[in-house]
Amino acid sequence: MSVKVKDLLKMSRLSQEYGDKVLLEKEIKTSDISRPGLEMTGYFDFYTPERIQLIGMKEWSYLMKMSSHNRHQVLLKMFQPETPVVIIARNLEIPKEMIDAADEKQVAILRSKASTSRLSGEISSYLDSRLAERTSVHGVLMDIYGMGVLIQGDSGIGKSETGLELVKRGHRLVADDRVDIYAKDEVTLWGEPAEILRHLLEIRGVGIIDVMSLYGASAVKDSSQVQIAVYLENYDTQKTFDRLGNDTEELEVAGVRIPRIRIPVKTGRNISVVIEAAAMNYRAKQMGYDATKIFEERLTDLISRNEVKHD
């Protein structure tokens, strides 16, 4: 997914100080951000002009101590055609020489009131998520009690219908049919809908419905962490399904593994309620409460007491 300079302006902390529509269309190709401290001294041997250049109090103070001529020369070297944007933190004053260099090299300038370190973290996090490689999977992504649950299964098993029932029960739809997933870091998956399918659900026999229009803004969510996967499959008497919850299965997406639960589907089962319980049970395990272990402890204790009685 490409990110353009104009996309940064959607962040409430940034305002445009220099640059026309053409400059705002420049692509940002890396999430790395440069703090051009050494460059201010004239050392450009390992300069990376393709990065966003972020100027904070230290860089600005050094720059302002220079003569107007030297300041202009340094900024001309720092502003390159491949530089996507220069950002000024702490709402610092923008010297005339910087505007002149930006005009000559055609580089946009943005400014923010935020501190340099906080601004750097926010922009890096935003770019990491936008520039991360996406993996598309078939399924329905729901936010259930704050847990991101990916519902998968064979075509026609009832994934979208289950998603609709969960929406009616107060949960939120993130994506239906195609879920775009990316690794936010080494252990965290994040999912979002394809833009053309945002807020939409396809129900066989009914067609496409707009969940936001029918159920309101509280029924949808633009993105969510993916914490657990649920796989729906037809009930088979010849197949053994996990009854205690101690059989661990995992789904790997984008190099990150998450737990996956297989749920048999047959007439009379309320699948949406089962998925709710699965989400709450997973959260309980994350908080250190494992019903399976408690059952095993009770069973072991009962067996021990029975053995004592027989002795």
UniProtKB/Swiss-Prot annotation:
Chain spans, region Important for the catalytic mechanism of both phosphorylation and dephosphorylation: 201-210
Range of residues in the leader sequence: none
GO BP annotations, alphabetical order: regulation of carbohydrate metabolic process
Sites where the protein binds Mg(2+): S160, E202
UniProt keyword list: ATP-binding, Carbohydrate metabolism, Kinase, Magnesium, Metal-binding, Multifunctional enzyme, Nucleotide-binding, Serine/threonine-protein kinase, Transferase
PANTHER family recorded: HPR KINASE_PHOSPHORYLASE, PROTEIN YJDM-RELATED
Family (UniProt): Belongs to the HPrK/P family.
Subunit structure: Homohexamer.
Protein name: HPr kinase/phosphorylase
Organism: Streptococcus sanguinis (strain SK36)
Lineage of origin: Bacteria, Bacillati, Bacillota, Bacilli, Lactobacillales
